[in-house]
Amino acid sequence: MTKETRQGEQNRPSYKESLNLLKTSFGMRANATLREPELQNFWADKGIDLELGLANKGPSFTLHDGPPYANGALHMGHALNKVLKDIINKFHIMRGHKVHFVPGWDCHGLPIELKVLQTLSNKERQALTPIQLRKKAAAYASKQVKGQMEGFKRWGIWGNWNKPYLTLQKEYESAQVKLFGQMVLKGYIYRGLKPVHWSPSSRTALAEAELEYPEAHTSPSVYVAFSVIHLPQSLSENLIKQGLELPGDEVELSKRLKVCIWTTTPWTLPANAAVSVNSNLDYSFVRHEEKGQILIFATELLEEVSEILGISFKQVANAKGESLKGILYKHPLYERTAPIVLGGSYITTQSGTGLVHTAPGHGIDDFKTGLQNNLEVFCPVDEKGIFTSEAGKFEGLNVLKDANKEIISSLEISGSLLKELPYVHKYPYDWRTKKPTIFRATEQWFASVEGFREDALKAIDDVEWLPESGRNRIQSMVRERGDWCISRQRTWGIPIPVFYKKNTNEILLNKETIDHIENLFAQYGADIWWEFDESKLLPPSLASESHHWQKGVDTMDVWFDSGSSWASVSCQRDELGYPADLYLEGTDQHRGWFQSSLLTSVAVNGHAPYKKVLTHGFALDENGRKMSKSLGNIIDPTVIINGGTNKKTDPAYGADVLRLWVSSVDYSVDVPIGSNILKQLSDVYRKVRNTSRYLLGNLHDFDPKKNSVDIDNLPILDKWMLNRTAEVIDEITLAFEKYEFSRFFQLLQSFCTVDLSNFYLDIAKDRLYVSAPDDPRRRACQTVMALIIEKLAGLISPVLCHMAEDIWQNIPYQLSEESVFKRGWPVSPSNWKRASLTEPISLIRELRTSVNRVLEGCRNRQELGSSLEAGLRLEITNQGLLDAIDFLAKNGDHDVDCIRDWFLVSQLQIGGEPWAEVLISQQFELGVIEISNARGYKCERCWHYEQDIGSCSEHPTLCGRCVTVMNRL
């Protein structure tokens, strides 16, 4: 290059200033840790949160919040649950509904009690009075509520934060006692001796919902032979007919005939009261040749038992289970006898021997069988899981530790042990202490589910369940469940308002006493049960007799607490609906809150407390594992939002990415979350943000009131884009209505990436940047972009609420609404819908995709840089595509709907003679694509290759089109 040429290059005018470049205050980066709190403050200042929903004029919508436990840091389960609720609430707010959402907390129970006790020394614990413990527990729970509340707010959750419900509030406690009283008066509450799930580690009864069932618990299972001392005459005669004659002498018979049982709880053998059989099963009398004994087993299990015991049997007789009733046997550990009785359908041939060791004090089926056969409910185990003196030589042994070993040893010494084997199975554990539980018969308070079971099953049918499988799940649970043990032997809870007569243990629990306690709790709270004596707790009519009565010490199950929320919250606030429109919790709540709420509501009012129930799965790590400290795989939502100590490995994504995750997953099953998933979500978030930024950046000089182009006068490409936007609005609306948020996620991603960025905006760049500012074709595109950005902000607002508001605040022209949430939900205008454009444009887009694939190959081979360096020739064999191109040519705007510009090439030829020099000629399903180097020279302003470059001496490096624009500026 000569000196003169170089000087000429330097003196050329720069055309950058003549282009319409992006201008927007909407940042490329979200800067979420700063910007999101700013937007939340904006909402709070303007009353644009739940206040907006309450001010709406539409129909009411109440999502009743299932109360999280007021203990511990927020985790991904909280995030999944609360964000799902918030997405639904925000959608209803945008639809103009009067939305009610009162956040709640479950504040009573053992975990909080234990947390308080852990802060005290042994001396302080011993000196602690019940009321002191309650005060400390209440303070602890209140502190936890405050911390969790701030976390929920940071996630962008809207709710009535100024008036949440807490199960420790006096108005809640009072309403719960009222509900309890209504169940008492209907005859559904009773006190009885019954085996319940008992936690020795917590020293209290547990409800089914308070249990976990780890898979790998190992129990010592034993096969035991009980010595028979008496046979019913009819059975003896039947055996003789089959050739089996047994001794009539009791001692000799006991040596010869054995009843064989199998149990995984050897520690319950001291409480054995019977052996149960199934009346419909066949049983075999088999000879143990080595010992000369006759053993009784279920016929179907003979082969399995023979293999396990390593003994060869010879069948010598058989009998129906019904005929075994009345056999008497000696207890192998004590000097007492017990009968064989008929049990229920729970006795099967799935495992064991078909004869079931029955201890009514240690099992529900055993208890029921005991009632039918007048068996004693014997339970020689105390609240710590220690054998009492009633267990004889086993007194003082822990039933879950050393008792099994000692009992098995005693069985072996007595000659009763046939086999001991470890048995791995599911076993109930205390969900709080993570330690095994037992069945233990104690005096407890129960809700008689049997009294309203059929009503509950009918109520389930009247509810809409999402997914539908939830209906069968809760129906089977309610159908099969026993009575509900509602009493707990702890201090931190709502007391069961009962009085016992000191001498007789007579129970005092009637409308007068319950009403009095209800009123006291409403005035003072439940603490007065411990602060007042009986003279004040009893109604005035009984105060003079208070010295004869003693108040109870049991508290209510926390599931009764939370299951009363419909009565304590929904029915106490006039604005809230009962039944609620929606309950939404994890799938584990079919046996928890959904069920406890259902049972209390049906018992009192005969219907469910909800119209619709939606359930979600659990949050797992990326490998599908449950999160735990031991695995080191816990994902902390706070770290997702604010970042970790190392921002490179744990960047601050902000609340919207967390919310986007919730919308991206199929929440009806367990859902994964991890660093790789977050990176992918961040990319999607960034794509939506950058697409929005591009739209905003091209509107800096646009005023819809002055510059809009009438929709009927828009080019075909713009009309198609509005039609596609209308389709997306309708599809996303339907997805939200059906709570299919992952469908929203897919539609949003496709709309921003495929429809906008890769197609419409890619084509629009030329007219946006290169045209004169007021060029009609640019104004047409800006008209469409303005319409889209306003709709897009509304569509993403339930999920990406912060981004939606940020977009709204950065729209450069005047809007009549100060917030996107005041605009309301986007609707698709009828004049946007032009179905006739869908098929031809789809065919052309398909062709464009094929062309881009061939151009990309040229770029990869370094034959081309920009696609504008290419010329394109097409041979099209598909008539539908030819018709589409012809439709565009005849009906389109020549300046915008020129198909050459849609392919972003400098020349286009359809059909005609092949070009002499080509880079590639490639067949595809619709014809042939031929790529060559573009003819002409590159325009320095628009970068198109044209043959009229240099025709204007004033602008020798510009094409004719750009010269025209420059002359207008």
Curated annotation (Swiss-Prot):
A motif ('HIGH' region) lies at residues 68-78. InterPro entries: aa-tRNA-synth_I_CS, aa-tRNA-synth_Ia, Anticodon_Ile_BEm, Ile-tRNA-ligase, Ile-tRNA-ligase_type1, Ile-tRNA_ligase, M/V/L/I-tRNA-synth_anticd-bd, Rossmann-like_a/b/a_fold. Zn(2+) binds at residues 939, 942, 959, 962. Keywords: Aminoacyl-tRNA synthetase, ATP-binding, Cytoplasm, Ligase, Metal-binding, Nucleotide-binding, Protein biosynthesis, Zinc. GO terms for cellular component: cytoplasm. Monomer. This is Isoleucine--tRNA ligase. It comes from Prochlorococcus marinus (strain MIT 9211). The lineage of its organism: Bacteria, Bacillati, Cyanobacteriota, Cyanophyceae, Synechococcales. The gene is ileS.
